[in-house]
A protein has these predicted regions:
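Surface-exposed, flexible loop/turn segments at secondary-structure boundaries
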Residues: 32, 72, 122
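C-terminal capping/extension of enzyme domains
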Residues: 36-52, 77-158
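Short, well-ordered beta-to-alpha junction loops that form the rim of enzyme active sites
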Residues: 66-72, 119
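Short, surface-exposed acidic-centric catalytic microdomains
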Residues: 1-43
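Short secondary-structure capping micro-motifs at structural edges
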Residues: 9-14, 48-56
């Protein structure tokens, strides 16, 4: 794929997602920022998308991949906050990174798995660098980077 911000690149990404039955849906429907940047922490006045309705509408969805964790304004954090409206919570399946949980939808009683992948941002490099699995990879393959670690993590879930 071409990694540019062009019509060709966008078309390639759309085709990839469609061909692999992958949907994208941001949990944040709207937010404001005082400082224009990409950080999650900078979001204010956050309105969350009604993901329960989205999940009930699309019964083929079995897994949600969060690109970020449970830190303030991260996707898992917002999803947990959103679920409280329904009186439901995530059930822990694995505490290892990436953390895996499941939730049972209130209407259909269908199980949805959630996987909290490490964020792709440069700011997440400190967190990656502190992980034991990253340190083990680095000892075995010194030329590998935090991005390589994320790619390996992402591959298992895509």
């Amino acid at each position: 794929m071409v990694y540019e911000n062009t019509d060709v690149a966008i078309s390639q990404r759309k085709d990839f997602l469609t061909n692999n039955n992958i949907g994208i849906c941001d949990i944040v429907a709207s937010a404001t920022r005082k400082k224009i940047d990409a950080s999650d922490i900078g979001m204010e006045d956050v309105v969350l998308r009604d993901l329960i309705s989205v999940l009930e509408k699309y019964p083929k969805v079995t897994t949600l991949l969060f690109t970020g964790g449970n830190s303030k304004n991260g996707p898992e954090y917002f999803f947990r906050r959103y679920l409280k409206q329904y009186g439901i919570s995530l059930t822990n399946i694995s505490s290892e990174v990436p953390r895996i949980h499941e939730v049972i939808l209130p209407k259909s009683l269908r199980k949805i798995k959630t996987v909290s992948l490490i964020a792709p941002s440069g700011a997440a490099n400190r967190a990656v660098g502190s992980l034991q699995k990253y340190k083990e990879m680095k000892l075995k393959y010194p030329s590998k980077t935090t991005i390589d670690f994320r790619v390996e993590q992402y591959k298992k879930h895509f």
